[in-house]
Curated annotation (Swiss-Prot):
Family classification: Belongs to the flotillin-like FloA family.
Name this protein carries in UniProt: Flotillin-like protein FloA
Species this chain originates from: Listeria monocytogenes serovar 1/2a (strain ATCC BAA-679 / EGD-e)
Keyword flag Nucleotidyltransferase: no
Subunit structure: Homooligomerizes.
Cellular component aspect of the GO annotation: membrane raft; plasma membrane
Upper classification of the organism: Bacteria, Bacillati, Bacillota, Bacilli, Bacillales
Gene field: floA
Cellular localisation: Cell membrane; Membrane raft
Regions that span the bilayer: 4-24
Membrane topology field: Single-pass membrane protein
């Protein structure tokens, strides 16, 4: 009995230590103390109970305090519970602080919760970003395609990040403006000779309004000539006209063949009446026997000549 008591006490102590070190990240608490960040053991235990990963909150807080930011653990924990990226948000605040950009925690958290990369927004507001667009195709007034790829230099506007249109809207607006500008050009050679005229006209249209960016410049990266749409349409029209003409000619040919067959039928019918007419003429005495034989000789002579002529042609 004297040995059971100490064993039970030892087991309880071990269980207590296991539970304690499970609930309390002692290493993280020591790191916070050494960095002079006011985080108590009770706060860390409360995070565990609220299913918050303490390192996801305390480490960014240590980083923020070291950078000279005035943040509290409750702010970061609330942002974590709301589904925000605490580490990225703190990095954005540090970058803004060092670049002398006015950005408080509430605005940074709102940008992050809106689904935008707040750190990228801060970095882009400091160092402009270059967006390379896909190929846009415009058609000049002479019917020749001009294919253009542009590079848009933009700078993030922190004030318009939440509620402002994104990168896709900027690209779509620039594409529409490029196509419209090329369409206003009389000759495609005018665009090739002066490509800056496109970028200048496009930039004058205020395409950055209502977006999260300020457009600094729009430059032509690549330009090439596409198909001659007008020539293609002319060829298609000529082919269509030719098909119509061929159809009309085929119709006339068919009508001529039909008329020829009708005439041949009429000739055959007329030839069939000749013997009857000769018979009536002989009966009525209008044609003599000698006249009839004379006519037969003429017909035989004509047939012989036609036969000889056909043989010579062969």
């Amino acid at each position: 009995m004297t040995m059971i008591g100490p064993i039970i006490i030892a087991v309880l102590i071990i269980i207590f230590l296991i539970v304690f070190f499970t609930l309390v990240p002692v290493g993280l608490w020591i790191s916070a103390l050494s960095a002079r960040v006011p985080v108590g053991l009770g706060t860390l235990i409360g995070m565990r109970l609220r299913r918050v990963v303490p390192s996801r909150v305390v480490k960014p807080l240590i980083k923020a305090v070291k950078a000279g930011l005035d943040l509290e653990v409750n702010q970061l924990e609330s942002h974590y519970l709301a589904g925000g990226d605490v580490d990225n948000t703190v990095d954005a605040l540090i970058a803004a602080h060092r670049a002398n950009i006015e950005l408080d925690f509430s605005r940074a958290a709102a940008i992050d919760l809106a689904g935008r990369d707040v750190l990228e927004a801060v970095q882009t507001s400091v160092t402009p970003k270059v967006i390379r667009t896909p190929e846009f195709t415009g058609v000049a007034q002479n019917g020749v395609e001009v294919k253009v790829i542009t590079q848009i230099t933009v700078q993030s506007n922190i004030e318009r990040i939440v509620g402002g249109a994104g990168e896709d809207t900027v690209i779509a607006r620039v594409g529409e403006a490029v196509v419209s500008t090329v369409g206003e050009t009389r000759e495609h050679t005018d665009v090739l000779e002066n490509p800056n005229s496109i970028s200048k006209k496009v930039q004058e249209q205020g395409l950055g309004d209502g977006t999260a960016y300020t457009i600094l410049s729009i430059d032509i990266a690549e330009m090439r000539i596409g198909d001659n749409i007008k020539a293609k349409l002319d060829i298609e029209k000529a082919n269509a006209d030719m098909e119509v003409a061929q159809a009309a000619a085929s119709k006339r040919k068919a009508e001529a063949i039909a008329l020829e067959q009708e005439n041949r039928a009429a000739v055959v019918a007329a030839e069939a009446e000749v013997p009857r007419a000769l018979s009536r003429a002989l009966e009525e005495g209008n044609l003599g026997v000698m006249d009839y034989y004379k006519m037969e000789n003429v017909q035989s002579d004509t047939a012989m000549r036609e036969s000889i002529a056909h043989e010579d042609e062969k």
